[in-house]
């Protein structure tokens, strides 16, 4: 329901991706359908009593700047500031600030680079959702069989939101792309 509601908003507000010479698509497509990932995570946090507050705050920060970027382009430095800040909040949640400062700097750069590299997959029907499902399935396996690092319900809730997204994206003519809000 949330995704269908978003489609109406995106259509009214003209949140679209127009094809250009680098595009793999040829028709105008709604952008920002990946907002469903945030809503899935938010649903988990609401049900769990905000178990991971710094993670939620970081996710909200990245969702905000990425959605703004989907609506109107924001500067690279602004986005990077938000991304580094969000990663620092996640590191705090995970207790990583006990590491040497240079490990933290390297980890911030690598993790921020990875989330931005993930963004390049968006726009090819099914690849963002498919890759996300593979990663989430691997994380669910590791979480269950190797080491528990998060409540399993969190991973399963996000998997459900990715499946909803795939329903609209993994087809010959995608109804939507994840946009920065879903791929970052």
Segments (PLM) and residue ranges:
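"…together with the soluble PPM/PP2C metallo-phosphatase catalytic core" -> "…together
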Residues: 1-184
């Amino acid at each position: 329901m949330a995704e269908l509601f978003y489609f109406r908003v995106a259509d009214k507000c003209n949140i679209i991706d127009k094809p250009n010479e680098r595009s793999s698509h040829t028709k105008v497509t709604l952008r920002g359908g990946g907002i469903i990932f945030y809503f899935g995570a938010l649903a988990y946090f609401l049900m769990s009593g905000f178990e991971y507050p710094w993670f939620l705050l970081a996710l909200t920060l990245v969702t905000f700047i990425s959605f703004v970027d989907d609506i109107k382009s924001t500067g690279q430095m602004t986005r990077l500031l938000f991304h580094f800040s969000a990663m620092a909040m996640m590191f705090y949640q995970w207790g990583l600030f006990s590491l040497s400062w240079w490990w933290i700097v390297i980890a911030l750069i690598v993790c921020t680079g990875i989330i931005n590299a993930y963004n390049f997959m968006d726009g090819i029907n099914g690849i963002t959702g498919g890759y996300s499902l593979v990663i989430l399935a691997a994380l669910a396996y590791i979480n269950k069989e190797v080491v528990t690092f998060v409540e399993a319900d969190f991973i399963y809730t996000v998997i459900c939101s990715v499946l909803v997204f795939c329903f609209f994206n993994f087809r010959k003519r995608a109804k939507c792309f994840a946009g920065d809000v879903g791929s970052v």
